[in-house]
């Protein structure tokens, strides 16, 4: 019991991870590594759309084809759909099972390979799946208890992270709306023309050329750019005689200006 309690505490310590620690490209690599070390298995976490959030391999079990899934950080649609249909932990799935993570071409090499899939859901929201696998050793009840705890802990962390991201998006969109509201009619026309000159989110432009084309003064363009830059929506840099380099930092500005029909 003491051994199980110690392992449980290691897993629940995941909740102490800060938001900054979850900003990486694969934010749950450290978590899957911790889980893999505790349970002695390979582990990965995917969200409900199949995006890989983290993984750790203690043992070599996959072919180059499957390794590619981990490199591209996205799982095949049919596998993701199958995982999303699992509502309770499915333990010790054999290599012959459709949801085995062992690829078809390597099943002869790992005939005793076992896969366990635990759904990650919080408050009725399906957030993803926790997948663990071994080459030849069955997952015992103690392992499965830890997997259930881990999926719950990761679910809570995922939900918190998702809410924080939603709040950031709201603040970002609000900042854009407020900045656009400060622009005059002429400045809005200028911003619309400027955004149309960019190659994606950045580009080089000449204010005087744009001003002449849409029939406004150069100072209107300068004022519009200053307002957006002070709001943190764009950044600009003078290129001297070549004009101005402009980069959009918050892409919501494109949609906001489009909504104003300028």
From Swiss-Prot:
Residues the UniProt record assigns to the DNA-binding region sit at 207-226
- Source organism's superkingdom? Bacteria
List GO terms (cellular component aspect). Answer: cytoplasm
Q: What is its main location?
A: cytoplasm
Quote the record's activity regulation.
Activity of CodY is modulated by interaction with the branched-chain amino acids (BCAAs) leucine, isoleucine and valine, which are signals of the nutritional status of the cell. Whereas both BCAA and GTP are CodY effectors in B.subtilis, S.pneumoniae CodY responds to the intracellular BCAA concentrations, but not to physiological fluctuations in intracellular GTP.
Q: Could you give a single Gene Ontology term from the biological process aspect?
A: negative regulation of DNA-templated transcription
The family database entries (Pfam families) matched by this protein are listed as: CodY, HTH_CodY
Q: What happens when the gene is disrupted?
A: Essential, cannot be deleted.
Record's family? Answer: Belongs to the CodY family.
Output the HAMAP family linked to this UniProt entry. Answer: HTH_type_CodY
Tell me a Gene Ontology molecular-function term this record carries. GTP binding
Q: Which UniProt keywords apply?
A: Cytoplasm, DNA-binding, Repressor, Transcription, Transcription regulation
Report if keyword Transcription regulation is assigned.
Answer: yes
CDD domains in alphabetical order: HTH_ARSR (cd00090)
Species assigned in the record:
Streptococcus pneumoniae serotype 2 (strain D39 / NCTC 7466)
Concerning InterPro entries, the annotation shows:
ArsR-like_HTH, CodY, GAF-like_dom_sf, GTP_trans_reg_CodY_C, Transc_reg_CodY_N, WH-like_DNA-bd_sf, WH_DNA-bd_sf
State the residue spans of region: GAF domain: 1-159
Record protein name field? Global transcriptional regulator CodY
Function comment? DNA-binding global transcriptional regulator which is involved in the adaptive response to starvation and acts by directly or indirectly controlling the expression of numerous genes in response to nutrient availability. During rapid exponential growth, CodY is highly active and represses genes whose products allow adaptation to nutrient depletion.
Cell compartments where the protein resides: Cytoplasm
